[in-house]
Amino acid sequence: MKVIIVGGVAGGATAAARIRRLDEHAEITVFERSGYISYANCGLPYYIGDVITDPEELTLQTPESFFKRFRINMKIHHEVISIHPDRKTVSVKNLENGEIFEENYDKLILSPGAKPTQPRLPGVGIDELFTLRTVEDTFRIKEYINKNHPKSAILAGGGFIGLELAENLRELGMDVTIVQRPKQLMNPFDPDMASMIHNEMRKHGIKLVLGYTVEGFKEKDNGVEVLLKDNPSLQADMVVL
């Protein structure tokens, strides 16, 4: 049996390993468009904050180690661009050289993951505006900080990754503000638990602007202006969505 898996991060890598345990003879190939497999998003902010200093510690497996352990072909920098169910093939693009080829399969598993949503707002796409979801995103933010030494940052969103990033940017000495439309951080939490998080963040000098909608961004000579609905705008050297 020949199995193709689209996506090689958490879900795809787990599925591949599980199939190998069930069938030691299956031919398993995983196509991953990024350069990394099997990494944990929650560790990314700690590389930005210099808690993790070795980038290799961000990944649990490499294509080489995965093959050695499971005999699974991990093809990084390969993007599945179309699926042909009638003939059981996929079209794959090698992102390193542009080559496009077809690969046949008996079983196909889709685990492409997700991309961070960039709101359709004025100013999205300016150089000082970042997203944080992948290892590549992490390196871009780290490189920007090392090169430009920003003193302030605005984080749009107060979920798990947002709070970890706020912690690490604050530890780097930056002035950090979290802005979001919900009136509490960590929306799934009960209000009394969220209140404890609010107090802890403020105790460490992190500003919270809650209950306000971001309407756009303006690039300024000294940073980025974040436009808010029904509230004065905020300004910082960089913004992370």
Model-inferred region functions:
Residues M1-H77, A166-F189:
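Beta1-alpha1 glycine-rich phosphate/pyrophosphate-binding loop at the start
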Residues M1-I4, E64-A153, E225-L241:
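FAD-binding core/adjacent interface of flavoenzyme oxidoreductases
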Residues G7-A10, R133-T134, G157-G159:
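Glycine-rich Rossmann-fold phosphate-binding loop(s) that bind the pyrophosphate
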Residues A15-A16, A40, P85, P119-L121, ...:
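Short glycine-/acidic-enriched loop or helix-start segments at secondary-structure transitions
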Residues R18-R21, G43-Y46, T89-V90, P122-I126, ...:
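Short, glycine/charged-enriched secondary-structure capping and boundary segments
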Residues H25-E27, R69, K75-E96, E103, ...:
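A Rossmann-like FAD-binding core segment of flavoenzymes
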Residues R140-F189, G223:
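Rossmann-like NAD(P)H-binding beta-loop-alpha module
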